[in-house]
């Protein structure tokens, strides 16, 4: 009996360490996923965006309201942000404000919160890009069947740009 107990204990230690990630690894992974998502957002690549969003996502925007499914969120994105090729919104995180907070259970990461501030720029055909405004964000990423997806999205404290300034 004791050899089986010892074997089971050793096996559980190895299994836990094999599946657990360090905070640094989780932070790097979430920053990478976040970067891919926002690159897709900036290019209106809705297929890539959709692949990083949970089916049961809840998105809360302090000016635009709430949407509570991936299908609803993507329909709004397609209609409001990606329907006019002569108008694009570009999102950029404010350097130094973005932080990732791993969420763990029994030492294994099951999620992470990424939070910070971001800027939004408008690109219109024939015009220079200009700053439209800024806001804060908090996103909950969850590990869902082996895949990291955004599950809860909060975009809040939106402010219009203090002055319209073209980006060089």
Where are these regions (language model features)?
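Sec-dependent N-terminal signal peptides
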Residues: 4-14
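A solvent-exposed, acidic/Ser-Thr-rich amphipathic alpha-helical stretch
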Residues: 28-29, 46-117, 131-132
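Short beta-strand segments enriched in hydrophobic/aromatic residues
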Residues: 53, 118-120, 154-157
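Extended, well-structured beta-strand/loop surface patches
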Residues: 112, 125-126, 136
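Short beta-strand edge/turn micro-motifs at domain boundaries
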Residues: 132-161
